[in-house]
Amino acid sequence: KGGYNEWIHPDMVGFYLPLDDWRPNVIEFNRLSDNNSLRLFSFEIKKALTKANYREAYFQAVSNSSWAHEGYLVAVDILQNDEFLAELERLASSFGIGIIQLDPADIDGSRILYPARGRVSLDWETINKLCEQNRDFDKFLQDVKIDYESKRIHRTEFDEVSKDIAKYIKDKMK
């Protein structure tokens, strides 16, 4: 979409709840505090990052992902040049969007080159706009809320990406 909505929709979103990492009483106590354990992530996915496209790709990720606790620019092929990598590191440090090098053959082999700067609070205005414009995102938030309240991840409620992330990424790279 052109205009005001062009760079608002991330390619992929995710969340983290420490249900398997924390004791039940800690999870309950956390729910009483202002420091919520739920974390939202946003990802902009590209086939490659080169000298020709990195600025546009990075600032698209800034625009699409700054609403979340952490935002990332993800690419399979990232130019391996010291000067180029230093520039990516500078951008990540300055604007807070991290860089992930994706290994589509082995998702677990992917690595964070430069971590995102975590945000304490979410950009609620942008989240509201995303929900108004994107039914899938609105449903995603509803499902996360249900999981948070029930203290159980209902994996069947999430889209096909979680079922076969490698296939989703390969399709996205076409």
Question: Which residues fall in each region the model found?
Answer:
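Catalytic core segments in nucleotide and nucleic-acid processing enzymes
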Residues: 46-47, 58-61
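Ligand-binding face of N-terminal immunoglobulin V-set domains in extracellular IgSF glycoproteins
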Residues: 64
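Conserved catalytic cores of phosphodiester-cleaving nucleases, focusing on short active-site segments
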Residues: 12-23, 37-50
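Intrinsically disordered, low-complexity Ser/Thr- and acidic-rich flexible linkers and loops
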Residues: 25-31
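A short acidic/basic microdomain associated with nuclease active sites
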Residues: 1-5, 72
